[in-house]
Each structure stands twice: as C-alpha cells, then as structure tokens.
Amino acid sequence: MDEVDKIIMHQLHQIDASIEPTEELANFTPALVVRAVASCLQEISQSLKDLPRSLPMAMAQRFNVATILAERCQESGYRGDIGYQTFLYPNPVELRRLLMFLIEQLPRERQSEDDANRTSHPLSSREQLERQIRQKLKAQLKMPWVPQFCRMVANRKSLGCNSQCISFEPQLNLNVPSANPEDRSKEVQQYFDQQAPNLFQQTSANCYDLIASVMHKNDLERWGDLPSMDPVTLTSTSDDLVGKALPTSPTQTSTTAEKAAQDNSSEATATSTTTTPLELLGQEVQELRTQTEIMLNHRKMVTSKLNELKIRETTASQEKETIESKLKSHEKLSLVLSEPEENVGKLEALVEATENKRQTLNQQWQDYRRPLLDTLSTLRNAQEAQQVQIIRNSIEKLEQEIIAKSQQHNELNSSLKNATQSVAPRQEYTRRIHEFIKNIRKQREDIFKVLDDTRQLQKQLNVVNAQLQRQFNYTDDLLFQSAKHDLHAKKAYKLLAQLHSNCSELVECVSLTGNVTKEIRDLEVQIDGEKLKNVLSRLQQITGDIQRSEQHIQELQTQIRQVENAITVG
C-alpha cells in the first residue's frame, strides 16, 4: 500500500499545497482529513465552494461539519460506510478507500480550465510559452501515427497540396545489400548490420520517394547492360504526360517523327559502342572528384592568403591608431609653440582661475561644514547624556531591587528560625519513620503467613480430594462386581452413587459461595472507593445546574411572552 499512499499524497499535494507529500495516511489528524476531503469535493464540483475546510473547537460543531462532509461524499457517489466517525476518528483503510474514490472522481480537464481562467488577465512571456508548448503537445498527441515512408505525402496533403503535384523523385545512389549473404565479406556484413542506414533513412534524407527509388534500383540491377536513354522526368504532372502522348497539330506529329528518327540513329550509334551507363557514371564521378580536389586546394590557398591579409589589416589598424595619437599630441604642441608668450599667459590665467575657484569652493565647504559639525557635537552630547540617564535609572532600579531582596531575605531568615523552633526535632521524625517501617514489616509477615496457610490448606484439600477419589473408585469397583450377584450390594452401589453426587453438589455450592463472597468483597471495595469520590455531592451539583438552566429557560419564556404581549397591545 506504500505506492498507493504515495500516489494519493501526490494528488492531494497538487490539489492543496498545504498538504505535504511526505505525510502518511496513518498519521492523518481529523483536521487534515477534513481539509483533504473538502479540497477534493470542491475540485469535483464547483457548487461546493462553501464547504468547511477546518474543524471548529466546539464538539457539536465538529459533529455538524463531519456529517455535512459525509453527506456530500454520499451525494458524489460513494457507496461505502461513511459517517462523522470517518472524519473524527479516522481509520487508514477507510480513509484510503475514500480518498481513492475522490481522486478517481476528479475532473480530467483541470488544465484546460486553468487556461481559460488565465485569459482574464494578460499573460507573461513565460506563461505564453508554456501555453504554446502545451497546445503543441496536445495537437501532436491527437495526431495519428504515420509510417516513415508516408510522412512526406501526409505532410504535403496536410498543407493542402494535391496528390498530382507530388514529385516522385528516386534516390539514384540507393545502397541495398545483396540477398545472398555469402557474397558479402565479414566487414561488409558488419557495416550493413550496425552502421549502414536503412531504406527509409536513405529516402527520407532529401525528400526522395521510397517506391520510385526501389524501382530505379531494380531497373539498374536488371537492365544495367542496356544503353542509356533519356529519362522521363518523374516530376511532370499527369496533364503534361497526356499532352505529350496526344499531339494537337500535324506539325507536331512531323516534329515528333523527326525526333524519333534522330533517336533511332542515336540508338544505332550507341549500340556500336561498348560503354555501359555505370562506366559513364564512374567516369563522371572520377572527373568530379578531381575537380573537387583542385577546388579544395585552391580554397586552402585562398583562405591562407585571406588570413595573412587579415593579420596585416589588424597590424596596420593598430599602427594607424598609435600614429593618430602621436599626431594629435604633436599638433597641440605645435599650436602652443607657435605663439609661446600668448599661450603661456593663457595657461597662467587658467591656473589662477582654477586656484580662485578652489579657494571659493573651500570657503563654501567650510561654511557648510561648520553647522554640520556643531549639530554633530550637540547630537553626540545629547546621546551621551541620554545614555548616562539610562544608566542612572538602571542603577536606581537595581538598588531598589537589592533593598527589597535584602528585606525578603531577612524575613525568610526570621520565618525559618520560628519554624525550626515550632517543628518537632529530627529524632521524633526518625522514631515515627521506624515505627511505620515496623508496622509495614509486621503486615508483610502476616500477609505471607496467610498466603502460606492458604497454600498448605490447598495442598491438604487436593490430597484429601485425591484420596476420596481413589477410595470412591475402589469401592465403586468392588460394589459393581458384587452387585451382579447380590441385591444388598446393588442397593449399596446405588446409595454410593447418590452419596457421590450429593458430595459433588456440596463442593460446588461451597465454591459458589466462596466466589459470591469474593465478589461481595470486591463490590464493597468499589463502593468504598466511590464514596471517597464524593459522587453524591457531584450529583447534587449536576441537579442544581439542571434546575438553574430550567429556571433560566422559564425566565426566557416569560420574557418572550411579555414581548409578544407588548407587540400585540401596541
């Protein structure tokens, strides 16, 4: 049940954050049970928003709250045994059953309701992003699964494209292993098993069509020795194919005938050569490889030159910055040296102006500083005086407390002296304690003596009972054997059986009387204990309270009657 409890606690924590998920159902208090059940009921039905979520202090109100929650659970469809005791005295098994039912009744569209509630106020960027992610996930979960080789067609149809404009372009370099595994080496087989992409991955890389690619590969394997022909473009639509198959004018028929003758002549010349399409493709691939190598080498050279030019550019820019800074300084010096007397006068005037400005600022600062220093000194003096006054007050309080404590100490000393004089001496106490101990020991010895006597008596009774039983069995056997032949022995046997039954009845009566006397003594002890509890006085107090409450009720009734009479008269 631990996993079930964890699930229940997780759901309750999502509904009400005040319920910790680390709690256990066995440790649920009545207040926590009421809060959890009320939260679940409010989530189930929006009309139950006024349900109490906590238990009041009064016992009557507690019963009312528990009965209301029990009725609401029954109205929700709970068929188990539920009442106020389920909430006030919770049982883990019943509580687990109730919470599981309420969690199953929770609405599944709580998230959509939260989204609808959020539209009433502007959403932040984070909330908008979370909402978009949630909507995207919902849409993806509702979409049906489509195989990998059909996803391109499905995506184009979802965009509104017609099936006639779909391009069935084949993958020309489809890599398919041979059907016979003996034709492949161990390395090739390992490559196809672990690293080689499958047909779906090869065709889905660049939007190739799977069926067209497989048919193209099959044609290459079957008709690879035939001469190459101009392939018909598979991307043409059905209207174009119909237009090509049905010419509209005789000029077109003549041109098509001329083209057919040229094609036949080219086919005748092609049959004379022995080159196959695969060899031509190999040659083209080789030429392309050489061209790519040349282009790569050229690219490396160009990149190296570009890096060198960038380095030169950075160095030139740095040199330019240094030269510009030096040039500015030289220009300033040249301006100063061009008219030395005038510039020196200007500098002296500037120095004098700055000195005058500094003096004025210093004077202003001193004028502003003096009142601040005065206020600071006054505040410090006031603070010190306040602290001194606080210390003096605390000293006076401590002196008063010391005087009061000393007086109390003197009073206690005097009371202690008087108590020691009035109380009995220590020897009297020890004598009384020894007497109590002697009495206790004497009582203990008497109790042990009574117990020993009862044990001895019990042993004697058991021995006598065993002897009587043996004697009865022996006499019973003798009389039974002689009763077969003698009438007097038969009568004696009957009298013996009657005597045995009477004796057993007497023993039972004695044991019953003993039990009754024991119960009587126990009841007497209980009665004495109840007498010590002053039950009569308590009953009298309760009856007095009842009489006072009745009098109060009668007074209220008379007041109500007077008010009614006043209303009727008025």
From Swiss-Prot:
Biased segments, Low complexity type: 265-276
InterPro entries noted in UniProt: CCDC22, CCDC22_CC, CCDC22_N
Coiled-coil portions: 308-471, 529-570
A Gene Ontology BP annotation from the UniProt entry: positive regulation of ubiquitin-dependent protein catabolic process
Example of a GO MF term: cullin family protein binding
Highest taxon, organism lineage: Eukaryota
Keywords, sorted A to Z: Coiled coil
Keyword Coiled coil attributed: yes
Region spans: Disordered: 110-129, 234-280
Polar residues bias spans: 248-257
Family named by the database record: Belongs to the CCDC22 family.
Protein's UniProt name: Coiled-coil domain-containing protein 22 homolog
Gene source species: Drosophila willistoni (Fruit fly)
Phylogenetic classification of the source organism: Eukaryota, Metazoa, Ecdysozoa, Arthropoda, Hexapoda
